Amino acid sequence: MGLVEAFGHVSARLPEGGFMITATRPLPGARAAEVLQLSDEGEIISGEAELLPLETPLHVAIYAARPDVGALCRTHSPHAVAWGARSAVPPLVIGLDGLSGEIALHDDTDLVVEIAAGAAAASSMGDADCLLIRANGNICSGGLLSEAVVRAWFLEQRAANASRIGDAAPLEGEQLARRSRHYDVELVRAWRWCRAQFGDRDQL
C-alpha cells in the first residue's frame, strides 16, 4: 500500500481483553505466527519479546484512553509525514479523503517508548481518528481493523492531494456535513477496494 517501509505496526483489540500487535518485521512479509498477544498493560502473553515493537506503549495508551477504538495502524506514509513535520493538518480538498476522519497533532518528536509518552500522545489525539506525530509518522484508529486501515490509506491520500492542489478552498461546515453523511457506506466499499488491490481477492 506504500504506507510503511521498514517501520510500522498494526494492532487489534481482543474481545476477551488485551490486543494483538504485529512483530518488528517488514509488514509485506509478516507472518501470522509472529503476531504477539499482549495484555491491556502491554505485557507479552504469547510471542517473542525481541519482536515486540518499541512503540507498543503508544498502542497501550490509546486503547486505555479510547474504549471505542478497536484497532490501530502506525505508519510513516510520506505525504502525511511531511504535513506532520510542519505540525499542520492537511486540509480536506477532495470529498472522499474525508474517510481519513478527524486528524489531531502531537508535537513531541521522540519515539513513544514509555507509557507516559503514550499517554501524552493519547491526550493529543483526544477523540480524533488519526494523529499526526511531528517528524514521526502517524497513527490511525478504527472501531474495526478495516476502518483503521482505510483511515490510514485516506490520510495519506488527503495529505498528497492537499499538497498537489494547493490553495483550493477546503470542505468544511455545511459542505462537509452533507458530504460526510455518505462516509459509513463509502468506508465499507473502500475496504473492499483495499482488499482487492493489496489483499486476498477470494475473501472480498
Where are these regions (language model features)?
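An anion-binding catalytic pocket shared by soluble metabolic enzymes
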Residues: 1-73, 80-91
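Conserved active-site and cofactor/substrate-binding residues in soluble primary-metabolism enzymes
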Residues: 5-7, 30, 53, 57, ...
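Short acidic/polar capping segments at secondary-structure boundaries
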Residues: 26-27, 77-80, 109-112, 127, ...
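Structural motif
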Residues: 18-20, 70-73, 80, 102-104, ...
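Class I SAM-dependent methyltransferase SAM-binding "motif I" and its flanking Rossmann-like core
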Residues: 75-117
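A conserved C-terminal secondary-structure "cap"
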Residues: 127-204
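A mid-sequence, solvent-exposed acidic-amphipathic segment
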Residues: 114-126
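Divalent metal-coordination and catalytic microenvironments
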Residues: 12, 62, 76, 121, ...
